[in-house]
Each structure stands twice: as C-alpha cells, then as structure tokens.
Amino acid sequence: MMGFRDIIGQEQIIASLKNAVFSAKAAHAYIFDGEKGMGKRTLAYAFARALLCEAPPGERMDSGACGCCHSCIMAESGSHPDIITLVPEKESSIGVDDIRSQVVNDVAIKPYCSERKIYIIPDANLMTEAAENALLKTLEEPPAYTVIILLSENKDRLLPTILSRAVCLPMRALSNEAISDYLVKKGLPEKDNAAVVSFARGNLGKAVMLSESEEFKELLGNIRRTVTGVRDMTDTDINAAAAEAAEKKEERDNILSFLLLWFRDVLFLKAGGDEDRLIFRDEVRELNKAAGNYSFEKINRIIQEIKTARSRLKSNVNAENTFEMLFMMMR
Ligand SMILES: [Zn+2]
C-alpha cells in the first residue's frame, strides 16, 4: 500500500500531516500546491488513508496507516466510501455544478463508516469563480468531520478567500541527487540520467515520465546531432533542422533547455572546469571539440541568443525563424 514512506522528499509536509493525523487535529481544508508530477495526488491519498485508518498510532509504522484494517483495505482498492475524489463533467474546468453536486450537497451526509469524510479536488486551480464561491460556503462552515484537500498547480489562481481558509502546503523541488538516485535504482542507464535530471528541475514525476519517454529520447538524439554537427551544415540542413525543432510546440522549450545546458558545459570546460562535474559527462569528446572551436565571446553570445530565443517563442513569434537564426549563429 502506498503511504507516506513511499513518497520521495517532501519531508516537511509529511511531518506536518503526520502530526495532524496523530494529534487528531486535522484542519478542514488543505491546499497541496505544486506542478504536475510533484506527487500531490499520492500525498493526498496517503493522508486520507492515514486519517481514516482504524489502527492505534503505535501499530501504523512509517506509512501513516496500518494497511490491514477494514478502512485501509477499502482505501487500497479505491472503493472507500468516505474518500471522495471530485470528477468534473468537463476536462478543462471545474464548474459550479460539479462542486455543488459532489461536495456542497454531499457534505451534509455523515461519513459512511469512518469518523471523517475526505474530499479530494484535483486540479483545483481549474475551478471557475462561481465554483470557488460555492465551495467557499462549505469552507466557511464545514461539518466537523470534513477534510477537503485541494490539489493545485498554481495557488495564486485561487480566490484569496479560499486561500485564507485552508492550510497551504507547497510541494518542494527535489535535489538533483535525490532524483538521480531514484532513477538509478529504477535502472535507468546513467547516460541519459544527467539530461533527464536537468530537465526535470526537481520534479520527480517529470523525471520518471521523461526517462520512460521514447519521444524524449528521440528529441535528445536529434538535438544532439544538430549541436554536434552544426558547423558542417549547409543552409538547407539548417533550414531542415530548424523546421524539425519548431515542429512540436510543447518540445521547443525542451530543445532550448538542452542547448543552454550544452553550451554551459562547453563554457565550463573551456574555463578549465572538472570533467566530472559536466551535465553531459558522456559527451566529453564532443564538448571538448566545441570548446576548441568556439571563443569565450562566441559561447557567451550563443547562450544569450538561446535565452532571447526562449522569450521570443513565449511571445509567439515564428518558431522556425527563431531556431534558424540560432543555428546559423552556432554555425
Ligand atoms: Zn488501517
């Protein structure tokens, strides 16, 4: 059974949630805030199970719940009647009807078989203002047994009145070492590890997703080929590479991140940095070649240009032209 002990990192949040469970002083509303992949859902279910577990604290160990009482078994099978996960009608937003029918009108009904009733609202930042106002009424006067957990990717999108009535727990970015250790334990070859860790920026879920993604591997392969071969490219080659880089909107930023990390490594090597501390340790030959080919000034200008490209792409300029200019400059 997944419990607190299965969650990597987030020690502070877990400590405060455990404290709420074992002191029997849970708040009526929580906001778990952090980007997708940070483990908000896992944490919410672990907390819900721990709150509803029937075993005395001494028998629960590190997971927060015993794993074998009636409540834990129901929770494990996803059929606990007192753990309610909101499922909105539409995918893109949570409307007032969703909140009314699944939360507001439901809270008055006493827990089915526990001392508490837990509501989990994923993607709470997608609530419409009307939905938030409907929820607010419940948050203002909740029945004693309710605990509402809002999972949010950006708490600033929530009404201040909601924020003021909930305990907000921001998910913390994990250290690169923690993510790297986890990936190694999962059996990911070290070769791709460094790039995945750098791209994940402290988000374990994202790291796992990237490490399993064939698309990401292909993307890395393509951009690697461009960056190492750019000096021999013809104009036609550059056009083709730019078109390819611009093709998938959601991958453009990843490509720029790769280039940025790559040229930082080149700069680091050129400045006499230790090879063991490179991000792309396995590419040291190519990096050394680049360090020999480019001047300090040129590398700095390329790095600057990559940053400019990133802000240009955010303002929706022609992506193909942006990549073309960048690749020309690298050539
Ligand atoms: Zn239990």
Q: What kind of region is each of these model predictions?
A:
Residues 2-130, 291:
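Clamp-loader machinery-focused feature within the broader ASCE/P-loop NTPase space
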Residues 99-100, 136, 163:
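"Short basic amphipathic alpha-helical interaction patches in structured regions
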Residues 133-150:
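Conserved catalytic/switch belt of AAA+ P-loop NTPases
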Residues 1-50, 57, 74, 144-147, ...:
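Charged, glycine-rich active-site and insertion segments that engage polyanionic ligands
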